[in-house]
């Protein structure tokens, strides 16, 4: 009789571009999301939770990779017997689902509709160091008003959010630009809306932060050699045609007034360009009136990312402190959030233009920034562990842990094999437990428990002298009736030591 073929065991590995998150990271992210939600709620925004799956039709062409519509997402087609054979996809951001939600429920929603949303998004793109296919976003949007006060409010809320999560003033800057100003520049160049060179110019402008003014000048003209030595063809503009773009990119002055003067020169007589400048001036006045100075929010025409997507103001939150990259070189941390006005997104569903403005915070990048600066909370304290000295007295240990929990103290009974007491303490150490509670048969007969301060014990083991150990022992005996009070007292003392 032939042997049955042995089935290979599945490999226990995460898919490429994905990762697992454990206790401390999850706790830190949960805390950050709650802090951000508190700011959004304070501004009057309401929470929205939409499906992680949308139809590809609903997502439309506002995909991560605009040059490859329907690429860059995790998509599949429903079977005909399950539905209509529709293509479905995991959401790649939180904005496209909002457009669908607003179009579907607009008759029941207040106008303007102010919502915030938080959660994972998925992008089927090539992963890299620190770049994953699943990551968290935290958005807030106002749909249904064209007022620049909405745009200004979003920028101010972003500033408040960064400070609330632990980025102090001086370590960040919210920079603001306007797509209409760029449209005015394109008009001043003689490039009308149907001119194919407009997209080439936009792509070139997007490289400004990488190649600088001289690089953009070359790419707008005949072309340039990149760092690898390869030649990149240029847009083919004459020098005089390229000047308005260069004037636009370098128009930031020492004051807002100077910047606006430079922008007016760049857009010339363009009506849409002048409209964009007026919007920036209005936003600037609103920032000033609310007490948000240029050390927090700054009008800056050099912000060009996303200008192909947005229809009006666009902004980016940049962290200005320096970090060391993987090669030990100093660099600025860079952008952690962005947003702007996108008046065309809902129109795909309704046929009518619906004004909207919003922001999106990259939660994982913001967490990485706080971790880099040592501004995240230390490793969270684990539960108090009630050890098991006699497996036949589990009811006694459960009674202890129940008392601790009823007093609001996080606690658990050791549920592994209690035979080796040392393994119980190793378990408590791995859980970052602050205290272990011990009650053997002798303690039970005498009506006492042993309490072991694991935090103090670790410190003593590292550096304390014999005299210090005698003066402040890490393990002591208390009456069983005082268990809760003594545990609480030690936890308060440990908390004070951490804060001190």
Swiss-Prot record:
Reactions the enzyme catalyzes: tRNA(His) + L-histidine + ATP = L-histidyl-tRNA(His) + AMP + diphosphate + H(+)
Keyword ATP-binding: yes
Keywords (A to Z) from UniProt: Aminoacyl-tRNA synthetase, ATP-binding, Cytoplasm, Ligase, Nucleotide-binding, Protein biosynthesis
GO CC terms: cytoplasm
Subcellular location: Cytoplasm
Coiled coil: none
GO BP: any one term: histidyl-tRNA aminoacylation
Alphabetical list of Gene3D superfamilies matching this protein: Anticodon-binding domain, Bira Bifunctional Protein, Domain 2
Enzyme Commission number(s) of this protein: 6.1.1.21
Keyword check for 4Fe-4S: no
InterPro entries for the chain: aa-tRNA-synth_II, aa-tRNA-synth_II/BPL/LPL, Anticodon-bd, Anticodon-bd_dom_sf, His-tRNA-ligase, HisRS-like_core, HisRS/HisZ, HisRS_anticodon
Main location: cytoplasm
Enzyme class: ligase
GO MF term list: ATP binding; histidine-tRNA ligase activity
Family stated for the protein in its record: Belongs to the class-II aminoacyl-tRNA synthetase family.
NCBIfam families linked to this entry: hisS
Assembly information from the UniProt record: Homodimer.
Protein name: Histidine--tRNA ligase
């Amino acid at each position: 009789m032939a042997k049955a073929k042995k089935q290979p065991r599945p490999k226990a590995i995460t898919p490429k571009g994905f990762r697992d998150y454990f206790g401390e990271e999850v706790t830190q992210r949960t805390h950050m999301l709650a802090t951000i939600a508190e700011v959004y709620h304070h501004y009057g925004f309401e929470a929205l939770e939409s499906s992680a799956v949308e139809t590809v039709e609903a997502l439309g062409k506002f995909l991560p990779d605009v040059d490859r519509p329907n690429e860059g997402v995790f998509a599949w087609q429903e079977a005909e017997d399950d539905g209509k054979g529709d293509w479905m996809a995991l959401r790649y951001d939180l904005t496209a689902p909002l457009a669908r939600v607003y179009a579907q429920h607009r008759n029941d929603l207040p106008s303007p509709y102010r919502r915030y949303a938080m959660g994972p998004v998925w992008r089927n793109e090539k992963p890299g160091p620190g770049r994953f296919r699943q990551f968290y976003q935290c958005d807030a949007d106002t749909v249904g008003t064209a007022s620049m006060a909405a745009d200004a409010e979003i920028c101010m809320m972003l500033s408040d959010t960064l400070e609330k999560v632990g980025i102090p003033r001086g370590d960040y800057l919210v920079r603001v630009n306007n797509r209409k100003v760029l449209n005015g520049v394109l008009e001043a160049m003689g490039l009308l809306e149907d001119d194919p060179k407009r997209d080439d110019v936009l792509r070139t402008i997007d490289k400004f932060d990488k190649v600088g003014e001289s690089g953009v000048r070359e790419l707008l003209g005949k072309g340039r050699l990149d760092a690898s030595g390869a030649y990149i063809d240029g847009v083919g503009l004459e020098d005089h045609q390229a000047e308005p773009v260069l004037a636009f990119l370098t128009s930031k002055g020492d004051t807002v007034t100077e910047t606006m003067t430079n922008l007016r020169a760049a857009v010339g007589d363009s009506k849409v360009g002048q409209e964009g400048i007026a919007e920036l001036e209005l936003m600037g006045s609103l920032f000033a009136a609310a007490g948000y100075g240029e050390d927090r929010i700054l009008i800056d025409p050099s912000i060009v990312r996303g200008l192909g997507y947005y229809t009006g103001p666009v902004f980016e939150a940049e962290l200005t402190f320096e970090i060391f990259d993987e090669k030990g070189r100093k660099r600025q941390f860079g952008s952690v959030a962005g947003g702007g006005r996108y008046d065309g997104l809902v129109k795909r569903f309704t046929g009518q233009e619906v004004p909207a403005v919003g922001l999106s915070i990259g939660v994982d990048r913001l967490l990485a920034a706080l971790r880099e600066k040592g501004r995240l909370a230390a490793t969270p304290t684990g539960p108090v562990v009630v050890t098991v000295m006699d497996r036949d007295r589990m009811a006694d240990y459960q009674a202890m842990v129940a008392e601790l929990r009823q007093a609001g103290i996080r606690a658990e009974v050791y549920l592994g094999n209690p035979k080796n007491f040392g393994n119980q303490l190793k378990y408590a150490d791995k859980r970052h437990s602050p205290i272990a509670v011990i009650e053997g048969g002798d303690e039970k007969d005498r009506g006492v428990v042993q309490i072991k301060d694991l935090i103090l014990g670790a410190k003593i083991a590292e550096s304390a002298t014999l005299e210090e150990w005698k003066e402040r022992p890490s393990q002591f005996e208390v009456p069983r009736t005082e268990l809760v009070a003594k545990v609480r007292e030690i936890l308060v003392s440990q908390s004070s030591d951490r804060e001190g």
